[in-house]
């Protein structure tokens, strides 16, 4: 793997360490004091070593120091490598900041994420995991369906750089391929670089965004100042050659403009065959980056809720209806699903998706979900089950309102174990029991943990 010294390095000192365990980010943890070369003043001090695995004895270069701990990067393994070590699949691993765990076996990656989730639940909520769900695994190595690729022109070198940020830096590392990006996108990166490099106003390009549906691809070019017509023509020629949708964006989302010549609908699409559903979305809409995990996640959420025909379900932070529509299929025509989302544009997209799928038992509302919503009519319909899929910040501000619904079952989908654990503590205080929890490998080879948890209301027993 490629490695370079951190720009924050205060020392080039190299030490020997025996790696004891993993950190939450997948780094190896060691302590000063075992080897004679360790300064006595550092004995007992914790060290985090990137790319080192438990059980390995390594040489590591210290790259960052604080009073409580130090950070280092692996230089060499002195004895047998860990059985959990594998060869990274990407030549850019170790420099590119996108992946952090390609050197770890998939099974060990899952175990690390389970440990992170369990320790957060115990630390923040005092909850113990009694039943683990079978991990939801990605079915493709090239799982990512969208990517933001940085573009920077260096006038002094007359050189264009296109790639991803380096680890711990704002610098871009040039990328010719990406092992975790859908190969239909990854294989296009070299020719896309050539197209951008030919532009007259290439210095005006800030970054590009690639997004995919099941069949369609969109290219969004973010630029600082107006591009000349000749550049737009070149971009349109390329989009036509690839049969891609092409968008330009100068400022905010309201400046998004489609400029390709296809005249096709301004949407991408993905299907969920298990529920006979099709979804439409725009390049700026939030969608899950891993299509195969999303498919499994939707089925798992519905299975955990054990929905019956005629039940009423509330879906908070519903987005474009990714969960709402499968839930509506489960409860049937006699049931009801209410989806609530902060973005009016996403609510409109959810309505469109429901109509496209001929679902009439679902309704959507736009509501700031960081504030009290208990006085709204939609919040007083009574719900048998609840699904919540908040952003990384979680839903702490409204957890006691959620608990007051007294739904029999709550499924909480999270991309942040810390906020899930914090919010789970509130549910526990309101009489909900954590029944099952699991990790979903939405972001393979990274430290990011996607999880799903089932809570059930405990029947109160009168003395």
From Swiss-Prot:
* Its EC number(s): 2.1.1.190
CDD domains per the record?
AdoMet_MTases
Reply yes or no: does the keyword Metal-binding apply.
Answer: yes
Q: Give the matching InterPro entries.
A: 23S_rRNA_MeTrfase_RlmD, MeTrfase_TrmA_AS, NA-bd_OB-fold, SAM-dependent_MTases_sf, TRAM_dom, U5_MeTrfase_fam
Residue ranges annotated for the TRAM domain, each copy included: 8-76
Q: Does the keyword Iron-sulfur apply?
A: yes
Tell me which domain of life the UniProt entry assigns to the organism this sequence originates from. Answer: Bacteria
Functional summary from the UniProt entry: Catalyzes the formation of 5-methyl-uridine at position 1939 (m5U1939) in 23S rRNA.
Q: Which family does it belong to?
A: Belongs to the class I-like SAM-binding methyltransferase superfamily. RNA M5U methyltransferase family. RlmD subfamily.
Name this protein carries in UniProt: 23S rRNA (uracil(1939)-C(5))-methyltransferase RlmD
